[in-house]
Amino acid sequence: TNVKESVDITFGVDTEAETKNVDSCLKKLHLEQGKYNLWAIPMPWFPNEYDEKVHGNRYKKLLDNLSEIAYNQHLKENINVFLPFYYDMDMGLIKDMVEKLKLPYVICDNSKALTLGEKRALFRFSNCNICMRFHSVMFSIYNGQAGVFISYSDKTSNVIRMMGLEDYLVEYGIRNSADFYKEFDLDMQRVNQVMDNIFSDDKKSIEKITSKMKQEAAVAQEELIKWLK
């Protein structure tokens, strides 16, 4: 069989928006480079799973913890931009967050008409990325931007550690039946340490990893095209 082993090119190959119209996402949202915090945060529990009596207190605590991050000295002067990944699932959490924060915000809802490439480019030009989905963590890394990488699964944690970026890693245990197979909340002392790491780092470490992975992805893309031909 004609099977080719390759690195994953999903994240590492730039979209047209990232290479040619890199600031179009900022123009659409009326943002300035480095003047916004990008949030990619999910509702931890599925709609058919969430039970206010069972999960309500943990959900409220998560909102409190995320709000505390927003008021961190490095973030509080910037606009908060919320990017839903699973729209119907994430919008409820986002609306609860903006109501709680009382800070300037932009929600990347369907009316903003951002392309996939423009959404990816948002990770590049932010002041800080707060990522709680695997794809958002990868988009941040591939755009050379450090962030608060909140992992709720071994998969995400292992990838972050493999890349040598555990200085940005925080973990969150959603449920006993999957992922880390235990429930635990955000360690805010750890979050504050990560925040200090982000804003004291010269970013050379993450930029080196970004460059290496983009090179690998480019080679893999060429190999894929040859293989398809």
What are the roles of these predicted feature ranges?
Residues T1-K229:
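Active-site anion-handling motifs in enzyme catalytic cores
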